[in-house]
Amino acid sequence: MKIERIDDKTVKWVYNGSEVNLSFSRKIFQVEFMEAAQQFLIIADYREVGERNLFIYDTSGKIVANPAMPDIGTTVEGVYSIWYIEGKTDQTVVLLTPQNQNYETKCKFSLIDFTFSHFSLTKWFH
């Protein structure tokens, strides 16, 4: 399945002969098609949608998951990015946290139960 970015705020694909469009008011950070699951992963701008800015959609355009951010003892503003590798059920994501400008929190995100785990700091290069 092919996903097309219309612009910074809109993506589309074809499902059963019909076009599916997803639009946001602000920039979409990242889009991934998860071939094995036949689902789309979209990271939207947290300033538009809040901390729950990670969305998983099925190919018909229905939301499969929109997980709450984990409680890690500090504010989590949302997901910054995913280091997506096709076929892996546990993916590495980088969380947006305001407390430290030199390091960010990375963790594992399960594509099975949509939970976050295995938190650690990673160097952030500005």
Residue ranges of each PLM-predicted region?
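A mid-sequence interfacial segment
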Residues: T75-T115
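Surface-exposed loop/turn elements that mediate protein-protein interactions on large endomembrane-trafficking
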Residues: D7-S25, N53-I72, Q101-K123
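Surface-exposed acidic loop/strand-edge motifs in secreted or periplasmic proteins
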Residues: F33, A44, V49-T59
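Repeated scaffold domains used in trafficking and secretory/extracellular systems
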Residues: M1-K2, F24-Q39, I43, D71-E86, ...
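Extended aliphatic helical segments
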Residues: V11-V14, V20, V31, V49, ...
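Short beta-strand elements that form the blades of beta-propeller/WD-repeat-like
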Residues: M1-R5, K12, A36-V49, T89-N100
